[in-house]
Regions:
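Conserved N-terminal entry element of GNAT/NAT acetyltransferase domains
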Residues: 1-9, 141-147
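Conserved GNAT acetyl-CoA-binding A-motif
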Residues: 91-103
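Conserved active-site tyrosine of GNAT-family acetyltransferases
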Residues: 111-113, 117
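Acetyl-CoA-dependent GNAT
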Residues: 5-67, 71, 84, 90, ...
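Conserved short alpha-helix immediately C-terminal to the canonical SAM/SAH-binding motif I
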Residues: 83, 105-108
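Conserved acetyl-CoA pyrophosphate-binding loop and the N-cap/start of the following alpha-helix
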Residues: 74, 78-86
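Conserved catalytic-core motifs of GNAT/GCN5-like acyltransferases
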Residues: 100-102, 118-134
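A short, internal acetyl-CoA/4′-phosphopantetheine-binding micro-motif in the GNAT/acyltransferase core
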Residues: 68-75, 101-102
Length: 147
């Protein structure tokens, strides 16, 4: 497995694993624009995209993981955690990273808790009946002290 920036040729691969861009032209266009802006990262095995993440500075100029998606058939294999850990590493110089997920997305909430993210609150009205929950994590280059 390799994590790399997405290329224009990955758009079709990304939309093949995530049903939202196939169902929404605007979401498809958003992912394409994000690839051109060099904010999309993929976890790939050969030419197959297993997961992708979109990392921007769109949240009050803070690093924000706008999207993290793992292909259905590749879930529960650690791909989400691997990609999330890389996004954290990319944000080290900023000292923090933010993200959000729907209240209904329990697996992502569990992953964020496992990785040490702190829950800050929720916003209603973005997805009808499914509030968005916001999280952040302080990042440090310091290595843990061993006893």
């Amino acid at each position: 497995m390799k994590i790399r920036r997405a290329r224009s040729s990955d758009l079709r691969r990304i939309t093949s694993i995530d049903p939202w861009p196939r169902a929404s032209k605007s979401r498809h266009a958003w992912i394409g624009a994000s690839i051109r802006a060099r904010t999309v990262w993929v976890l790939a095995s050969g030419t197959a995209v297993k997961a992708y993440a979109i990392l921007t500075r769109s949240f009050f100029q803070r690093p924000f993981i706008e999207q993290l998606y793992v292909a259905n058939e590749d879930r529960r294999r650690g791909h989400g955690e691997t990609l999330l850990a890389r996004m954290e590493k990319l944000c080290l110089r900023h000292g923090e990273v933010w993200t959000s997920t729907n209240q209904s997305n329990r697996p992502m909430q569990q992953l964020l808790k496992k990785r040490g993210f702190i829950r800050h609150g929720r916003v209603t009205g973005l997805d009808k009946g499914d509030p968005e929950i916001f999280y952040s994590k302080r990042l440090s280059r310091k290595k843990p002290v061993r006893a």
